[in-house]
């Protein structure tokens, strides 16, 4: 679980880094053509600047998600807490039975079948 979360975070960081890199022109262009191409780019940058706010929100959401994952119960303690909430007359009162199915293994051991 933790490995999957780490992988998602690394992929999100790499994607954000790739999207944040500027586009480099491949060939040298005349100064007049370069100015003509820069005008739409400037307008595009002006439009995209408010878009940095959702990126900040995405970072905040990722941080909140990671905190929730760290606080989530895991392992044996969560199983023991689940057992405490069960009714004492419940059929499955053994902690080893929580979270898995035995498919009748114990019932087959309890009874001797004639062969």
Curated annotation (Swiss-Prot):
PROSITE patterns: GASTRIN (PS00259). The gene is Cck. The precursor is cleaved by proteases to produce a number of active cholecystokinins. This is Cholecystokinin. It is found in: Secreted. The keyword Secreted applies. GO terms for biological process: apoptotic DNA fragmentation; axonogenesis; cholecystokinin signaling pathway; digestion; eating behavior; memory; mitochondrial depolarization; negative regulation of appetite. Binds to CCK-A receptors in the pancreas and CCK-B receptors in the brain. It comes from Rattus norvegicus (Rat). Residues 1-20 form the signal peptide. Pfam families: Gastrin (PF00918). Belongs to the gastrin/cholecystokinin family. The modification Sulfotyrosine is found at residues 97, 111, 113. The record marks 106-107 as: Cleavage.
């Amino acid at each position: 679980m933790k490995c999957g979360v780490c992988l998602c975070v690394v992929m999100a960081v790499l994607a954000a880094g790739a999207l944040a890199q500027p586009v480099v022109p491949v060939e040298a262009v005349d100064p007049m053509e370069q100015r003509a191409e820069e005008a739409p780019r400037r307008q595009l940058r002006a439009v995209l600047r408010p878009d940095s706010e959702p990126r900040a929100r995405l970072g905040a959401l990722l941080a909140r998600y990671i905190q929730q994952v760290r606080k989530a119960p895991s392992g044996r303690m969560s199983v023991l807490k689940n057992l405490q909430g069960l009714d004492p007359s419940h059929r499955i009162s053994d902690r080893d039975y929580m979270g898995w199915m035995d498919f009748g293994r114990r019932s087959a051991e309890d009874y001797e079948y004639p062969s």
